[in-house]
Curated annotation (Swiss-Prot):
Family annotation (Gene3D superfamilies): 3.40.1370.10
InterPro entries found in the cross-reference section: Ribosomal_uL4 (IPR002136), Ribosomal_uL4-like (IPR013005), Ribosomal_uL4_dom_sf (IPR023574)
Protein name as catalogued: Large ribosomal subunit protein uL4
Keyword Nucleotide-binding: no
Keyword Ribonucleoprotein: yes
Signal peptide, first to last residue: none
NCBIfam families hit by this protein: rplD_bact (TIGR03953)
An annotated Gene Ontology molecular function: rRNA binding
Role this protein plays: One of the primary rRNA binding proteins, this protein initially binds near the 5'-end of the 23S rRNA. It is important during the early stages of 50S assembly. It makes multiple contacts with different domains of the 23S rRNA in the assembled 50S subunit and ribosome. Forms part of the polypeptide exit tunnel.
Length: 207
């Protein structure tokens, strides 16, 4: 499958042949894409939520009032779950939310996400992702030429330091090396920009 190569000025500078098994899958599996996104989001959760149980909450274990004769329901401790300031029953505990997902499914998710963006016309191949200076204003002007609201930029094995620094302060713009390409960021950003080096490395990695 042939597609155009653009410069950072959004001008056509050539053509490149893309592997159809990676960038032009015929049937997009949304279920696989969702599986991989759920796996990513669960893995990213900190899991540090926690409430105190009866044994952990600060306070006395003294009986609040005598067993009989007050007309109240019997109580055994001021730290019980039904008392104000008491412990919490069955509350959240510190734990990992990470789940397991086979590597083949993760690989398929990336292939189908790239194919979906390509089918939408929102995946663009750029000849070079290098800037002379780390100027945010200059990069904003460049990205405005593509008329997109958000950009996920994938470079080769290494990211140009000037491009990376310039992109840091731009809302909804992320740049990563090819190893950082992931389904969640590909789907949530409007445009995916790939350098020519990224295309060749991704094709080798996902073959």
């Amino acid at each position: 499958m042939k597609t155009k190569i653009f410069s950072l000025a959004n001008e056509e500078v050539g053509e490149i042949s893309l592997n159809e098994d990676i960038f032009a899958v015929e049937f997009i599996r949304d279920d696989i894409i969702k599986q991989v996104i759920d796996w990513q989001r669960a893995k990213a959760m900190s899991g540090n939520h926690k409430t105190k149980t009866v044994s952990e909450v600060l306070g006395t274990t003294k009986k609040p009032f005598k067993q009989k004769g007050t007309g109240n329901a019997r109580q055994g401790s001021l730290r019980s779950v039904q008392m104000r300031g008491g412990g919490v029953a069955h509350g959240p505990r510190v734990r990992s939310h990470a789940t397991k997902l086979p590597k083949k499914v993760r690989k398929l998710g990336l292939i189908h996400a790239l194919s979906e963006k390509c089918a939408e016309g929102k995946l663009l191949v750029i000849d070079s992702l290098k800037l002379d200076k780390p100027k945010t204003s200059a990069l904003v002007n460049i990205l405005n030429k593509f008329q997109g609201k958000s950009f996920f930029v994938i470079d080769g094995n290494e990211v140009d330091i000037n491009f990376s620094l310039a992109a840091k302060n731009i809302y909804n713009t992320v740049i990563v090396p090819q190893i950082g390409a992931n389904v969640y960021d590909i789907i949530r950003h409007e445009y995916v920009l790939l350098s020519q080096e990224a295309v060749s490395v991704l094709e080798e990695r996902l073959r």
